Structure formats: structure tokens, C-alpha cells
């Protein structure tokens, strides 16, 4: 036998390695009973339970525990949000080599917001707000102290807590949760993650308390749970729902081992052991990519003592979840097994996202059961657990999409509301009883295994196995009963098969009889086939005519497109000419602005010259006044000396006279020089006037020439557009008149066809009723004749004949009733088809009239639009011509004004020159008079100043120097006058010579004179008779190789009859060789009603709404069978023989003909042949 099996227990397996509390030196256990074991013990709930314990110290422990739980549930009933933390790692070597930019910004090392750059095309960046945000500069200890340490404190207070890392693969989830798991002499590495730090911190907080710590480590790989701490190779774990009180559901993992630890080092060894078993693999995104989700659970039971001395156990649990990262298979390069792993990981994470969305939206159904991951996290998301999510993200731009997804999930998870509650406390004795029961159970299994008393399992396992065997036995008996029932059913089915076989033989006999009856109706089908062939020939003619009309319509459409294209070219040319006119108008406006600027400049120059001359006059007057003052002072000073020295100057009279003559000569010379300068100014003025006049006259001539050219071009364009619009209007008028005529003809033809169709339908109905009446009469006559013959033979075979008569009469009566019913139904369907056809014809006529109205409206609208466009263009042309003429007149006016203004300026300049000349003469005369006066005074004073002549000579020398200085000053003031007056005039002349008007430059866009080609003759369709004649000739050529026996020629006496048509049968199912269908007008002179055999009513017929007509004389065409049956009893035998001969000549198999006729008769039974009738006609017509 196999070794003893271990009993499966409903409770998790534990290793009883309870750690004993360490005691400090000099302390005892009773002293620790009143000390606080943890900072969280001083919570409000603990205070309440202590208060209740003090009030009732004599109550038992169970009552105190229940009261404590009720108090806790009353106090802690508030919802709390999930704590969400974001941690951003730095760029790795791969991202640095790829030069992937950074798209994240945080508020320093620790903050609460993260800003995401959405790229240059985004309107703005995206900002997320979380409880805490850590940048890449934050180390492991910072994250632990700010995030995990408060959660550890809450766990020690009795809460269930969960921390799980969520994010893209390769963003540091495993590094955050586990990190560097090595320790040196009890000192953790700086890169140690949350789990090692939690273990060390936990045991440091529990150093002075009596407690137990147990750990479990499970893995979710490919949706299968595995225990990473189990000694077995592949332990299978199962998840069950653990329903607690008040309907709250939690999950329980069956078969998971929970190992008790007594130090942080032991816990780290378990973590290392499980991490080595965890599934990892290398991808393009991460060299050590986690391929599974892991949950490291730490459960703490702390013994506490109330103030009354009662001991109880307070449990707390911390779930540390390391999720596998979401992965893009295309970027990570996962294949085969790795691709399957990535798909399952993404599936579980998507389910987690749906759970988060459902919790945020407060949906009625939360999809926890869609994934084992969400079932494990069920209590952490929306349950009674305090939860913290650490979202890890990458700052690289290459991971922007995954980063946005991670931040969106984390941001939505903030809105999840949990209801954390402190775990129920358990008295110490209750916990010991549970441990004792489990120990006893394990001992029983161990004893059963050691003794090997025949069953290597416990009694419970053996009973369970017996129950499974009994269940299998019951299932086997049920299957055996089902087999017996199925065998009995099979026997019944065999009997039913035999019965069906006999019925099949009977039906086969009936089928043979039916086939015999079917052969008797083949002649009717053959006759119908002949009628159908004639109808097809006529349909081919109609289809050919329709195709001809369609081709003509396409040609007319092409002509219309050409006309529209020509119209588009004309409009484009008009737009180009209008653009040219706009450019010329802009050029004229620019030249006018230039002339206004020139006029302003000339006015400014003349004003400046006038101002400068006036300033010169002012300065010159001041100098003269100064000189006069100085001379007067000098004379007044020296009069006394001259009077005393006059006697001494007599000898100088001659020299004084000579000096006077010289002064007069020099003054005259200065006068002549001034006159010469003024003459040069006058010559310069005449030259400027002549040049400016020539420039303005040239400008006026150019403006006149431009105006004449523009007016000429607009006149030519006006005539061309007038001709083009007239031609276009004529063409459109011709097209619309043709369309209106065509629509009117179609309307008349439709009315005529409607009248003919109604007459034909009435005649067809009357003929059908007559045939039905004749058929009933013939049946009665045959019945009477058969009765007479049976009475003669009654004496011999009375009984046999009576039975035969009754059967024959019953069969005949049934067939006749069926035929009569089908004929009536056929008449009703014909009336319905006629009504429907009339309604469709009315709709067609209405649409045609509507179309004609639309065409007329479009014609009037186009005519109005063309007239409006022409009037607008004519008005625009007149406006442009007037504007051009006004521009020319304005240019001439401006030029005349400029010439007049220049003349006035030159006249002012002449006045100035004359004024300068007169002033110079007066100055010369005054100077000579002054010299004469001085000379006379000197001569009179010679006698008195001779004694002082030496002093006078010195003073005269000084006066001469001053006079020379003043003379030089006068010359210096005169020289700038010439420059100030001449230079502005020279600049003005140069400006006029260098400034030219802008000339029009051809752009090459102005359209050239072109010839518009368009079609003036519209295509038309040939006459119907010519087209039909051509089709008949073609068909005659096609039937030449066949014998005359294969053709059915119509009677030569039929009016308008076509040549003989051949019928060629092809043994292909449902295939008839016909030409493409055409539609045309119907020639009423060659139409007739096809024959309809009274016995052809085997199936309902669908009547088409095609065109129908009557004969030339309006009488219906009746089939030979109907005619002979109407004439009497001698007709049917000869007619029957005629039908059989026709069938024999066609040589068409009966079955194939029946199938073909069934397809060809569908919808075409009573379509009258348009145009020409090739069918067989009656040998005699009934009188109308």
C-alpha cells in the first residue's frame, strides 16, 4: 500500500514556533501588564473598553469581548479613502541611450502633484493630485517612513492593512516592495525595500510585548495560486469565500502554509526563499521582469491585558502585494510562453481596473470573481481594510502612454471608499482551545500514519473516500438505466421505419400516376413555350430600342458637359479681365498719390526759399544799421578834430578826389556783379519751368494713352461677352425646348398605352370567363354521353362500371374544380396587376409632369440668372469706363494745377529778382551819395583838421579795417544766399527728373482671344422601324443554319407579321438564349394577345407591370385550343393531335421543358408583345 496520506484540513497549516517575549533585566511580567505595548493602544476604542472594564470588573471575559466589539463597531463606521502614493523612478540606461526625454515634473523630492507633459500639440499639460508624490531623488527610507510606517502602527492597533505596488513593467515595483534583501550584522542595506524594513520595524516595536508573528508568501502565476513557502514542488491552493458576520465576505486560501517567525532575520530568509521560487524572466523592457503577482502576508497576534487583569489577543494583518507590471507585447518582445504570461497578467490587471471603476461608480455588481487577483484583493478594495496603493511610473517619453494609464487608474482609485474596522479581539483561552484542537487533529493523523492499521489515512479522509465511491456507484446505475431506455426507444424507431417504408411505396405508386398525368400536360407547356419565344423576340426589340435611347441620352450628356466646360472657361476669362482692371486701378491710385506728394514737396521748397531770403534781408539790414551807427559815432568823435585839422588837409584834396572816383568805380562794379547774379537766377528759373512743364505734359499724354487703351480693351471684352452670352442662351433654350418636347411626347404615349392596356385587360378577363363557362358546359356534355354509354353496358358489368364511373367522375370533377379555381384566381390577380400598373403609370406621369415643371423652372431661372449677370457686367463695364475717364480727367486737372502753381512760383521768383535789383540800385545810389557827402564834408573840413591829420590817418586806418571786416561779413552773408536759394531748386529739379510714374507691367494672366468650340447639332435616335428592321435581319442571319422543320412560321395573312422565327432549345437548366432587354415605344399596329391554354394553371403566376397592347383592330387574340373548345366537341381531338405533332417536332425532353417553362413563365405569362406579333393566331376571330 502507499504511504499514509495527510488529511486535508479546512484550517491553514501552521508551524508552532511561537516566540516567547524577551524580558528586560529587573522587570517582571506583572509590571508589564499595565504598560502600553504600542502607541496605537491608546486609541479611543481601547479607552472605551477600559472604561467598561472598570465599571464591571466582575463580568466574564466573553461578555467583555462582545461589548468591546459592539463599541468598536459603533465608533468605527466611517468610510475612508484609499491612500494613493506615486513614485517616479529615474531614467534607466536603455532610455538614456534612446535619448528619450522626460515628461514628468514633481514638486521636489516630496510633493502632492505630478505634472505630465502631453507634447507640443496638446493644449495644456495634465496635472494629477495624490496624497504623496515622490520624485526619483527619494530613497527607500524616505518612502518607508512617510508611507509605510503609519500603516504598520495601524496594523499593530488591530487593523487589517494592505500595501500593493501597481505600475508598468520595469518601473520599480519589486524594488520598492523587496529591494535589497541582504543584511549585514542586523543592519539593512540602503536599497532594502518595504518588506524587510517592515519586519525589522515590527520586531523593534514588539520587543517589550508578548506576541506571535506568522508569515505567508503566495504567488499568482498564470491564474494559478502557488505557495512559495511550501516544501512540496507544486502545491495547489484554492480560494474560498469566508462569510463573516453581518454578511461581509472575505476570502480564505486553503492549503496555504503560515510560518511563525521569531525575528526579522527569519522573516527575511522566508522572503528570500520565496523570491527564489518566484517566476521571473528577461524582456526588452526589464532584465528581471516579474511574471507573477505575489502576496507576502504578516499576521501579528498581540497579547494585551485590561486594567482588571484579563488577557486577550488583538490580531492584525498586513498584506504586502507586489503586482506584475502591465506589458506591451510589441515593445517587450515577449514570445510563446512569455507572451502567454503577459496576456494573463494584462487580463488580471484589466479586471483590477474594472473593479476599481465599478467601486468608484458605485455599481451594483463588482466583478471580483472575474480574476483570482481581484478575489485576493477583495477585502482591500471596498472592504474593511486600510489600503495604500504605490503607483510606480517612468519619466521617459517612450513610456508616456503607459504612464498616463497608470496615473488614471491611481487617480480613480483615490475615490474608492473602504470601511476599516479593528479586528475582533479574542480571549487567550479561546485561542489556546483552537490550538489544542488543531494539535489533537494532527496527532490523530500522525498516529494513523505510524500504526499502519490497514488504512493510511484518518477516519475523516476514509469516510470522505467512501462517500465518493458511493456517489460513483449511483452515477453508474443511472447511466445503465439510461442505456436500457435508449435501447427500447431504438426498437420503436425500427418499427416506425418499416411503417414509413410501406407508406413510401404507396406514395411512389401515387407519384407514378401523377407523372402520367404530368405527361398529358406537356403539350400545354410546349404551346406556352412557343408563346414565350414570341414574347422574347418582341422583348429583344424593346430592349434594343431602349439601349438606342440610352446611348442617345449618354451622347446628350457628353454634349452638356462640353457646354458646361466652355461656360467655365468663359467665366474664368471674365475673372482674369476683372483682375487686370483692378490692377490698373491700383496703379492709377499709386500715380495720383505720387503727384500729390510731388506737389507738396514743391510747395515746401518754395516756402523754405522764401524764408531763407527773408532771413538774409534781416541779417543784411542789421549789418547796415551797425555800420551806420559806427560811422556816425566815428564822425561825431572826429568832427572836432577835423575842424581843427581842416587847414592841414588842403594838400590832400586831390588824393581825396581820386579816392572818391575809385570808390564810385568799385561801387559801380559791385552793382554790375549783383545784376549778373540776378540774371543767372532768372535763367535758372526759366530752365526749371521749361523742364517741369515738359514732364507734366508727358504725364498727361501717358495718362490719356492709358485711358484710351483701357477703354478700348473693355469695349472689345464687352462685345465678346455679349456674343458669348447670346450663343449660350440660344443653346440652353434649344436644349430645354427639346427636353420639353420629349417629355410631352412621352406623356402622350403613356396615356395611349394606358388606354390600350385597360382594353386588353378587359378583353382578357372576358375571354377567361367565357373559357371557364365553355369548359363547364363541355364537362356536363361529356358526363351525359358517358351516362348513355354506361346504360347500354349496364346489364353486363353493372357493378364494375358503376365503381369505375364514380371514380372517374370524382377525379374529373376534382381536376375541373381546381382548374376553375385557378382560372378565377388568375383573373383576380390580373385585375390586381392592372390596378397596380395603372397606379404606377399615374406616378410616372406625375413625375414626368413634375420633371417638366422643374425643367421649365430651371430654364427660366437660368435665363434670369444670365440676364442678371449680363446686366451686372454691363453696369460694371460702364462703371469702369466712367472711372477710367474720371481718372484721366483728374490727372489732366492735377497736371494743369501743377503747371499753374509752378508759374505762380516762378512769377514770385521774378518779383524777388526785380526787388533785389532795385534794392541793389538804391544801395549803390545811397552809397555814392554818402561818398559825395563825405567828400564834401572832408573838403569843407580840410582847413580845420590839417593839424591832426596823423591821428586822423590812424583812426581812418582803423575805420578802414572795420569797414573791411563789415564788407567781408556782407560777402559771407551773400555767398550762402546763393547756395540756400539755388540748392533747393537744384534738388527739386533732380527729384522731378529722378521720380517717374509707375508703368503698367503685363502679368501674362490676361486671357487671349480664343475661339469657343461647342456642338451645335444634338444627336438623335434612329426611327424605331429602322432599328427593328436591323434586329430582324440580324436574327434571320442567326437562324440560317437550321432546318425549316425547327422553325414555326406564322400565318402569312397576319398583318404586320414578322418573318419566321426559329426556336433553338438548349439542354441547360434555366437557360434561355435571349438578347439584352431594351425598352422602346410600342407600335400598336403589330400587337396581339397571346394564347393562354385553359389547362395551364398548375401554379400561381406573377404578372409583371410591363407594357401591354392589343391587336390592330382591338379584338383579343384567342388560342386555338380555346377556339376549338368553344366551337364544339369535334375540335379537341384534332387540336390534341396538332399539339402532339408540335411537341414531337421540338424534340425537347418533357422534364427539361417543364423546368425551363417554370422559370420562364415567372412574371411573364400575360405580357403582351410590343411592336410586332410572331405568335400563332386563331384560324377564325370571334365577332366583336
UniProtKB/Swiss-Prot annotation:
Residues where ATP binds: 167-174
Coiled coil location: 489-900
Residues bearing PTM Phosphothreonine: 1006
Protein origin, superkingdom: Eukaryota
Function: Important role in mitotic dividing cells. Microtubule motor required for spindle body separation.
Alphabetized SUPFAM superfamilies for the sequence: Apolipoprotein A-I (SSF58113), P-loop containing nucleoside triphosphate hydrolases (SSF52540)
Record lineage: Eukaryota, Fungi, Dikarya, Ascomycota, Pezizomycotina
SMART domains: KISc
The keyword Flavoprotein belongs to this UniProt entry's keyword annotation: no
Ranges of compositional bias, category Low complexity: 12-24, 1049-1060
Subcellular location per the Swiss-Prot or TrEMBL entry: Cytoplasm, Cytoskeleton
Primary location: cytoplasm
Record keywords, A-Z: ATP-binding, Cell cycle, Cell division, Coiled coil, Cytoplasm, Cytoskeleton, Microtubule, Mitosis, Motor protein, Nucleotide-binding, Phosphoprotein
Biological processes per GO annotation: cell division; initial mitotic spindle pole body separation; microtubule-based movement; mitotic spindle assembly; mitotic spindle disassembly; spindle elongation
Entry annotated with the keyword Amino-acid biosynthesis: no
Descriptive protein name: Kinesin-like protein bimC
GO cellular component: cytoplasm; mitotic spindle; nucleus; spindle microtubule
Organism: Emericella nidulans (strain FGSC A4 / ATCC 38163 / CBS 112.46 / NRRL 194 / M139) (Aspergillus nidulans)
Annotated ranges, domain Kinesin motor: 81-416
MF term (GO), any: molecular adaptor activity
Biased composition (Polar residues): 1-11, 32-51
